[in-house]
């Protein structure tokens, strides 16, 4: 039986999540990609709580013309890094959520690194 793209992504996601988890000292940066928006959140897996979250949806309320392209993804990365710095989070574990590390996912990671977040 052939898997769809999303089913293949979910299988990759399960394999990745077996290996990584976020702690209070080094939480997990999760990226989700939809057709219209890009979402990023920093999660502490020991307590199961979201520490910081942002998306192109929340950024587009304050800035005009932010979409789910590479430029918007880089803005999401910079914004999540800024919010993390405000909460004294210096380093994270990057969870690509089963997506290939390319394009918009890579742009989020590059934007976060550029803003000073360590992976």
From Swiss-Prot:
A GO MF term: structural constituent of ribosome
Record's GO cellular component terms: cytosolic large ribosomal subunit
A GO BP annotation: translation
Keyword annotations from UniProtKB, A to Z: Ribonucleoprotein, Ribosomal protein, RNA-binding, rRNA-binding
Domain of life: Bacteria
CDD domains: Ribosomal_L18_L5e (cd00432)
Subunit details: Part of the 50S ribosomal subunit; part of the 5S rRNA/L5/L18/L25 subcomplex. Contacts the 5S and 23S rRNAs.
Stated family: Belongs to the universal ribosomal protein uL18 family.
Job of this protein: This is one of the proteins that bind and probably mediate the attachment of the 5S RNA into the large ribosomal subunit, where it forms part of the central protuberance.
HAMAP family listed in its UniProt record: Ribosomal_uL18_B
Protein name: Large ribosomal subunit protein uL18
Gene that produces this protein: rplR
